[in-house]
Amino acid sequence: MLNRLEKGDEIEIVAPASYIEDREKFNLGIEILEKWGLRINKNFNLNRKYGYFAANDRQRLSELENGQNNKLIIFAKGGWGSARLLENDPKWKNSWMIGFSDTCSLLLSKYAKGYLGSIHGPMITTLSEEPSWSLQRLKNLLFEGFVEDIFGEPLIGGIAKGDVIVSNLTIFSYLIGTNHLPDLKGKIIIFEDVNEDIYKLDRIFTYLRMSNKFDEIIGLGFGNFFKSEVNNSEEKNLLKNLIHERFKKFNIPIVIDLPIGHSNGNACVPIGFDSTLNGNNGTFSVNL
């Protein structure tokens, strides 16, 4: 377990991908962290743009590496561009680093290279949209070193105990064949994504089956894949049936509808820590 945060600690905001469009959400995210007693490095330049990125690759990589000198990096937003930084093999350190969606490429790379601190969770521009329980969960993790159980819908029974990896599904699939994807043997894997067509998800699931990457995982979870307005739609049932059909052959516990991802709360999960996924009752717990 890395050092816990304390009031007065300075933290770093890094934009490894797209530039900031919604300044209001950015500022609201800052306010939340400042209310927790954290000091924000004010060097972040909201006006900087380089095409559709927050800066050029060299600048973004430098800020990512230097930001690790603080206890915590929280990413500003996703979009696209994080994976471009992996071409230059970032110099990682053991420090907390929070993000999701596109920035999962960085979270996974850091863990794959043997460093702790990757947290799949809200970013600056999404913090203000989080329900109170999700914000409290993140605060508990960073300041107190614990998180409570979360719950989903059990799909295939069984209990898995092992280190957990959480990622955006699409980003995870793009890292197959690179040295930035962690070893999956004995791991619990949890995926999130947003508003992908069902045939595209089928394509990725089939690719994962064919890649043999799932032959040695011990549990599988799925977070939010749709925005809230379609949570009870036919598309959700199609996805549930697709997950069952594509992954039942692995004979591992599977839980769906965990509150992780782009809607309904994005429960933070520290990557690489011992966890339990219960496919009998839908519970997921992290053992810190």
Describe every region a protein language model picked out.
Residues 24, 163-194:
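Conserved beta-alpha junction segments in alpha/beta enzyme cores
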Residues 115-177:
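Conserved anion/nucleotide-ligand pocket segment
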